[in-house]
Amino acid sequence: MILSLSNGIFSKLSLVGNFAAVKQLGFRNIEFNMKSIKKEHDTDVYREQKALAASGLNCLTLHSAVLHVKDPIEVHQAVYYGKISLECARALHTSLMTVHSNVSKKLPRQIRERCLKEVFGEIKPFAKSLGIKLSLENLSYTSTGFGKNVEQLEEVLGVIDPEGEMGITFDLCHALETKETDNLLEKYGRRVCNVHMANKAHKPFTKETPELKSFLIKLNGYNYVGPITLELVHNTSMEEIAKTKALFEKIFRKY
């Protein structure tokens, strides 16, 4: 399997410092998180393109800037975030972008459906024109967004992706917290095209736990080869990241 690191963990650093920290740890692949940009709506995507090229890193995926719309008046802002993220994905030469549902879990169903249609009615055609695949992430129970389990994801996908073209970004941390790991894998295992890897609360795995082993075995059964993207809490130390990297490299030799 292919190992990658979300550079969102170094979002407080400059872009050059961010990429340097990733390289210092020995990673070759990253998921570029739009949180790494000081202002997520910044349109200067060529700065990111230049910094990535200078680093020599490969950008396998990009995590979109996110706004969980809680009122229809915010739809235009969510669309803007999505389109700027897609522009950045194109500049970084990645063909896969992770997205959230972009709607608040507090919205009534009728308004939620309306907002979903309006947001993705703009984002999906733009992504298609750029040759970028969208991948919907399962959310945590603490998230303000809608889409934490199969029932909610099915509602979202039924509105925005009836053709079944979008992928799934499987966030193991979120699935463990919502106790939806098996249900999500059973439903979406063949659509997974990115995995956000972390233990509960986005803490690093320190060993191959029974839950992790079971997940990887089942994922391997779907012939998934990566990326496995380490997405870790911001206070994870460089030493802890290095140990987690070594752990997964050891585990991957078995698959």
Model-identified regions with their sequence ranges:
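Histidine-acidic metal/acid-base catalytic patches
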Residues: 1-7, 11-26, 93-95, 147-255
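Glycine/Thr-rich phosphate-binding loops of Rossmann-like dinucleotide-binding domains
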Residues: 40, 107, 144, 205, ...
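N-terminal pre-domain/capping segments
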Residues: 1-94, 190, 249-255
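Catalytic-core regions built around general acid/base machinery
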Residues: 44-55, 119-126, 156, 184-187, ...
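Hydrophobic residues within beta-strands of alpha/beta enzymes
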Residues: 30, 60-62, 97, 134, ...
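Active-site-proximal loop/turn and secondary-structure-junction residues that shape catalytic pockets
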Residues: 9-11, 34-36, 65-68, 101-105, ...
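Active-site acidic/histidine proton-transfer and metal-coordination neighborhood
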Residues: 54, 71-167
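A generic structural signal for short
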Residues: 6-7, 36-38, 73-74, 111-112, ...
